[in-house]
Structure formats: C-alpha cells, structure tokens
C-alpha cells in the first residue's frame, strides 16, 4: 500500500487505475511491491524524491539516469526543478523540526501536509538525516540558481539540470 501511494500520490483516479492494472497483472491475486516498482505509474514528485535519495546516497550516476528518463518523458525542466526544490524544502523542514525537538506530526500540521504524511515525512526524515543544515541550505542555493538559469539563460536546459545534480552531490558532501 505504501509503495503504491509513494509512487502515485493520493490521486484517487490514478490509484484506482493502478490497482486495476496491477490486479490484472497479478491474476487478481496478491500485488507485490516488485510489481508496483516495475509497472506502477510514478508521479513527478515521487521520481524527483528518488533522485534526491540517489544523490544523498552518492549515486549521482543513477540520479542522472533518472533525470534523463524524466526529460525523455517530456517533463518540463522547470517542473522537475520545482519538484526538487519542494523535496529539499521538505528535508530542511524535517531537519529543523528534529533539531527543535518537534515531531513529524507537528511538521505535517504546521505546513499543511495532508493524506499519508507520516509515510512521506518518515522517508524524508531518513534522507534528511544524511545532511547538516548548512548542506541543505547550499543545496537550496544550487536549486535557486538552477531555477533562475532555466528562466533566463539561453543554455541548454538538460545541461543545466545535469550540472545542478552534480552540484547537489558536491553540496551534500561538503
């Protein structure tokens, strides 16, 4: 259940379609996590969070590959960047809350996270634990610059995105 929500979000129409598709694949038996991972539709937010986790784990090559896939699927670079920014802001919020001895429930309430926030913020907390506050601030600066460059530069957006992923990897290690 959590894997499907993680990949599809809370869109009831999308969830119903995914469950129908996966149920047919399983012969109307048990739907496994492997089936969800292999064939489940993914939202941009889920894909970009996967990219963040890959970068945080030092697997930049795989993050670059996921970026190439997102771009090949005609996702707009500015939308990918916005989703990345959202994911890094989530990590910053969770990290600051932890430093202030506040719970994930407090974060969810304070920032209006709805639905299955406990799973989402729990995953965010695990990823954020690899960072110090200054590293996340540097990552947000990298993404702010990327956003500005995508909106104003004549340079190739794909190259700007690839460069930013490398800079995020470096910022997360400094």
Question: What residues fall within each predicted segment?
Answer:
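Long, charge-dense, solvent-exposed interaction surfaces that engage phosphate-rich ligands
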Residues: 1-49, 54-57
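Helix-rich C-terminal "collar"/helical-bundle subdomain used as an assembly and partner-interaction module
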Residues: 59-174
């Amino acid at each position: 259940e959590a894997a499907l929500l993680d990949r599809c979000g809370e869109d009831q129409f999308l969830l119903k379609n995914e469950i129908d598709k996966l149920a047919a694949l399983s012969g109307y038996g048990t739907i496994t996590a492997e089936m969800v991972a292999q064939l489940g539709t993914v939202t941009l937010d889920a894909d970009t969070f996967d990219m963040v986790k890959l970068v945080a784990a030092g697997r930049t090559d795989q993050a670059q590959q996921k970026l190439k896939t997102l771009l090949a699927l005609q996702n707009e670079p500015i939308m990918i960047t916005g989703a990345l920014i959202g994911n890094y802001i989530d990590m910053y919020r969770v990290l600051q809350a932890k430093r202030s001895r506040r719970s994930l429930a407090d974060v969810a309430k304070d920032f209006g996270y709805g639905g299955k926030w406990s799973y989402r913020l729990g995953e965010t907390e695990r990823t954020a634990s690899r960072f110090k506050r200054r590293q996340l601030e540097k990552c947000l600066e990298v993404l702010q610059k990327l956003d500005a460059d995508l909106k104003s530069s004549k340079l190739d957006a794909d190259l700007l995105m690839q460069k930013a992923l490398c800079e995020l990897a470096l910022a997360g290690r400094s």
